[in-house]
Structures are given as structure tokens and as C-alpha cells.
Design a protein with these regions (language model features):
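The conserved beta-strand core of Leucine-Rich Repeat
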Residues: 1-408
Length: 408
């Protein structure tokens, strides 16, 4: 920088220094602040840090391990947490999370737990709890917060799989830190005044069925996007709380939680039309959270009549074709679908149904498998159903087919 080491740098007015900072990236702001003490004082001017994107956790990488990132996180949140308007926190996965599972003839079988991997996961969990406490603690009194986005890791930060309840008990005895995290979120929501975007996906122990009740009336009236995705058994969004969100235009939740009652509420004439609906269907959870009571064909018709521009995104994880055919109603305005599975086959009948019912709305189709035996096309077929799907869906712009080949 031309002014580096010059007396002139200290003589510049604060307004001009802040204006210079406004043209720099976050990293360049930090470098420029080393010019002198006066520039460092201007570094934390609120208008310069309206948005903060943080990625923490995971294994060792060029940016350090998850625990090594904690002091940096504390520094940023201590200086910006009280006034930042948009905060995005992403927890990255630990390396090697797939090793506890092994595919056997199209099935997933548990193998012996790796002690070293388990230790890494426990360390990641401890770090996760500390970092989430830090973030929520620093924004608890932020009344200007407009966007809060928390994204965890589906494979690690869940009280299931390789991290069972006994492991979690060792990390957080009595659930003290989890309870503290939940209380901090309640304070964040109750103190908020302008939240327009609230999203929490796969964040262990952060959101409870009672969390939305603490949302202030001001934020309830301004909220436009709500995303609550988790594998918890109780529904995180109740009709009573959803009724308060009259300006909601985008909603993301578990497919099993999108009940007929919620659909009727969203189709009401005293609220803003819904533009985007994202639904996650987890096949492994269907036994505990059945599809009974989810939106029917008539419910979808009423919702689309009220929200003419509604588009739906469905992510199906390890869902059998029978359950897929059950939820893919004709009136569902499907725009994007992501089929990701390790132990179930995507049948040609499912592909044909999608191609026929959603030929005028489907724009994104993603098919991911962990073996080479998909889709199940049968033996007497001349037409490839994937080719027919691409041909029939006139607005299809993204087609992704991913196969993980394994050596025999």
C-alpha cells in the first residue's frame, strides 16, 4: 500500500479510511489495518462487516484443525457478533467419515469401529460444542441480525451411527452444553427485531420444537425464509408457530413434517404466497417418522392454487421407490429432485413417473449411487429411461449422474 509507513496514513479522516476499506476484501482489510493504530481502529466499523461467512471444524487442513480455529472464531465473533447483519456458519466434516460403513452386495453393513476415527469424531464434537457456544453467545444481543444460517454435518454431528448416545454422554455429561446452546438460541431469537432468514440444518442439539416460540413478534412478521432440517423425531415446526410467519416465502423442512395441516395453513389467503418449498426425505427415518398425515393430492392442489409460482425441491436419501411413488403427487410442482442412496435402487418406473408428471416443471435432476447397478432398467428395454426423462422434461437444464466405482 502506498501509504504504508507514511505519516499521511495517520492523518486521513476516519470516514475516508472506512471508505477505502469498503473496496477491499476481508483479507485485504486485515492487511491494510497493519498500517497504523488509527487504521486498526477503523477496521471494526460496523458498516464494513454487514456479512460474515465462517467455516469451522473438520480435520487437519491448511487452515489448521478445528480446535486451532477456535481462537480466530472467538476474535471475529467478539468484534463483529454484536452488530453483524448476516451470519453464515458451516461446520465441515471430519476426514474419513465413510470408513465405518462397508457395502456388501448392495447393502450397507457396519464394520468394527476404528478407535482412532472415533477419537477424532469425539474431538470434533467437543470443538463443535465450544464453537457453537461462542457464536450464539456473541450474537445473543444483536438486534440488527437479519440472516442467521447454521449448517452442520449430516454424518458426524448427529446422535446416531458411529457417535452413539454413550459417546455423546462422554463428550457432554448431562447435556449441559447442549442445553446452554438451546438457551442461547432462544435469547438470539427473542432479542431479534429484523430477522428475514433463519436456517439450521443438521446442527446437533441447537433447535428444539420450542425454539420458534421464542421468536420476537417483530421478527415473526419479517421472516421470509425458514429452514429447519434435522433427524429429530419431534416436528420442529408447529402449525401455531408457522401461523405467525405471515410473510414467509421460502420453507425447508423434513418431508414427514409437511403435514396436511401445515399445507392448509400455507394455502390460507391471509398470508404471502409461498415461492419455494424444500423437502428432505430420509429413508432411514421413515420407520420412526412415517409418511402418514403428509400433504395429499388435494392439499397440493389447494396450495398451488394459492401460490401459483411455487416450486418444490425434493432431496431423497436412501428412499425406496415405493415410498417415492407415494409422495410424488401429480399436483406437486417439482422443480428439482436429488436422489442419493447407498442401499436402494432407483427403478425405471420411478424415472418414468418423474418424466411424465413433471415434464413441464423439472429443471434439475441429480442421481447419485454408490455402486454400478443403477438404475434398475430390467432386461427387455430398448429405451433408456434417463434419456427419455431428459427428452420429455422441456425445462431440464441440469442432469447429474454420479456413480462411485469400487474395485472387486
Amino acid at each position: 500500500m502506498a501509504l504504508y509507513g507514511c505519516v499521511g496514513a495517520m492523518a486521513l479522516p476516519s470516514e475516508l479510511i472506512v471508505h477505502i476499506f469498503s473496496f477491499l476484501s476481508d483479507r485485504d482489510k486485515l492487511r491494510a489495518s497493519s498500517v497504523c493504530a488509527r487504521w486498526r481502529e477503523c477496521l471494526f466499523y460496523p458498516s464494513l462487516w454487514t456479512e460474515l461467512k465462517l467455516r469451522v471444524g473438520g480435520g487437519a487442513n491448511r487452515e489448521g484443525s478445528g480446535s486451532e480455529q477456535t481462537p480466530r472464531l472467538e476474535f471475529l465473533m467478539r468484534n463483529f457478533g454484536s452488530f453483524v447483519r448476516e451470519l453464515h456458519l458451516e461446520v465441515t466434516p471430519v476426514d474419513g467419515y465413510l470408513s465405518p460403513l462397508s457395502g456388501v452386495e448392495g447393502r450397507i453393513e457396519p464394520v468394527e469401529r476404528d478407535p482412532q476415527l472415533l477419537d477424532r469424531w469425539k474431538d470434533a464434537m467437543i470443538t463443535y460444542l465450544e464453537q457453537v457456544l461462542c457464536v450464539l453467545g456473541c450474537i445473543r444481543n444483536n438486534r440488527n441480525l437479519q440472516k442467521l444460517s447454521l449448517y452442520g454435518d449430516t454424518c458426524i454431528l448427529q446422535d446416531e451411527g458411529i457417535l452413539d448416545s454413550a459417546d455423546l454422554q462422554q463428550v457432554d455429561q448431562g447435556g449441559k452444553k447442549i442445553k446452554e446452546i438451546q438457551q442461547l438460541l432462544v435469547e438470539v431469537l427473542s432479542n431479534s427485531r429484523k430477522i428475514k432468514w433463519l436456517s439450521s440444518a443438521f446442527m446437533l442439539g441447537v433447535v428444539t420444537p420450542c425454539s420458534l416460540a421464542s421468536l420476537s413478534n417483530h421478527s415473526a412478521g419479517s421472516l421470509e425464509h425458514l429452514g429447519l432440517l434435522d433427524n429429530q423425531l419431534p416436528c420442529l415446526v408447529s402449525p401455531v408457530e408457522l401461523e405467525r410467519l405471515v410473510h414467509l416465502r421460502s420453507l425447508a423442512l423434513d418431508f414427514c413434517d409437511f403435514t396436511s395441516e401445515l399445507s392448509h395453513l400455507l394455502a390460507g389467503g391471509d398470508r404471502a404466497p409461498l415461492h419455494r418449498l424444500s423437502l428432505m426425505l430420509n429413508g432411514a427415518a421413515l420407520e420412526a417418522k412415517p409418511l402418514d398425515g403428509t400433504a395429499s393430492e388435494d392439499d397440493w392442489k389447494a396450495l398451488v392454487q394459492r401460490s401459483a409460482n411455487l416450486r418444490v425441491y425434493v432431496m431423497a436419501l436412501d428412499v425406496c421407490s415405493q415410498d417415492l411413488l407415494r409422495v410424488l403427487k401429480p399436483s406437486l410442482p417439482l422443480e428439482r429432485i436429488h436422489l442419493d442412496s447407498y442401499s436402494t435402487l432407483v427403478t425405471d418406473g420411478t424415472l418414468e413417473l418423474i418424466a411424465q408428471q413433471y415434464n413441464k416443471t423439472l429443471s434439475h435432476f441429480v442421481l447419485m449411487r454408490d455402486d454400478t447397478g443403477f438404475p434398475d432398467l430390467g432386461i427387455n428395454r430398448n429405451e433408456d429411461p434417463l434419456v427419455l426423462l431428459a427428452w420429455r422434461c422441456v425445462h431440464l437444464s441440469v442432469l447429474v449422474i454420479h456413480v462411485a466405482f469400487s474395485s472387486v
